[in-house]
Each structure stands twice: as structure tokens, then as C-alpha cells.
Amino acid sequence: MKLHVRNRKCIRHISFRNMKAAKTRNIIAILAISLTAILFTSIFTVAMSIVYGYEQSNFRQAGGYSHGHFKFLTKEQAEELREDPLIKEWGMRRFLGVPYDAPFQKSHVEISYVDENYAKWCFLEPVKGRLPKEGTNEAAADTTVLALLGIEPEIGAEFTMTFDVDGTETTETFTLCGYWDFDQVSPANHVLLPESRVQEILTKTNWQGLDGMTGFYSL
């Protein structure tokens, strides 16, 4: 049944009078609705923040947030995977070596080449400076490595490291081109070199790839 009301002005007037008569009640109702909306928004925001923080912590402990990881590939295998149409984006790393002697006995430090994508996805982007350029002796490192070496984090500073390359010890000097704060949940400290310098050191140390890691690529 549908009623047709002709005197809408009268009904509107009565409605306004009713609202004025219950002004306090209406204000309380509006406040209650507003506070409820704010409460649910706050709960949702806090929940999303907790989930995001948990995910980021897991990513940092794992060493990165890419969808997949192929380790210790030959150059040919890495190039074949890069061209696979199912891989939307990729980042590259080439492992060089690790230092064992003082001052790194209690720290796991990895020396390697990484490209921009790999650095981004594995939380290795310099907050000051940049990644090293090819054809130079530049290096980027986290602040913990620099502190252990007694080096102030200043772009252009030179530092020397002795490290193992597939069973052969070598001592190399680098020029700092970038650095970032070390994350305490990260599984390793890092020193990043240009791939040209990595290849130069591999050649110098007569690299054979016997350990299955040194000189190989990760994607």
C-alpha cells in the first residue's frame, strides 16, 4: 500500500520539531556512530601495521623479498633463466668470497657483485652514495663492516680487506662509494663490488670454482 502525502511541508516541520526536542539524544547518537567508525578504522590500521611489520621482519631475516631465488648458477644458466618469459623481473648476484681473520671472526661478511634490482630486493641499497661503477675499485658496504675496519662512513674513504676466494687468500683495497645501516636481523654483512672487479680478483686468484659457490651467479 502506498500513501500519497500532499502536505510535505507540514511533515517536514513536524520532523524538525521532533529533532529539536531530542537534540541531546541525536548528538549522542551521532557521536556514537562517529566514535564507532573511528574505532574500527583504528583497529584495521593497527592490524595492517602489525601484518606489514611481521612480513618485513620475515623478509629481512630471509635476506630478501623476491618471489623466488636460484643460487649458484653458471653464467649460461643465469642468462637462460633471465630470458624465460615467465620471469617478469630479475636481479643478479655474483659471489666472490668471505673474510675469516680479524676483525671478522665473529661476523659473517659476504663480498660479491649485485645489480640494482638485487640490491633493492635484498635491502642492500646505499642510503648514502651509490652502488659501485664498473671498471673501478669502488665498493659499497654496510656500516658494521666499516666499523669493524675502523673506517668512518665517508664517501671516498679507502679501506683494505683480506678475504678468502675459493681457498685462496687475497688482500684488496677499495674506495667507498656508498653505505647503508646494517639490519640486526639480516643473516649476513655485505661488501658490494662491480662485476669487473669481481672478475679481476677471480682471475688473479686462479679461480677454479671448486667450492660450487665462488664465482657463480644467483638470480
Regions from the PLM with identified roles:
Residues 11, 37, 41, 121-124, ...:
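Generic secondary-structure boundary/loop-capping signal
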Residues 1-38:
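N-terminal Sec/SRP start-transfer signal
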Residues 48-219:
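Basic-flanked hydrophobic alpha-helices used for secretion and membrane insertion
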Residues 21, 25-27, 35-63:
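Alpha-helical transmembrane segments
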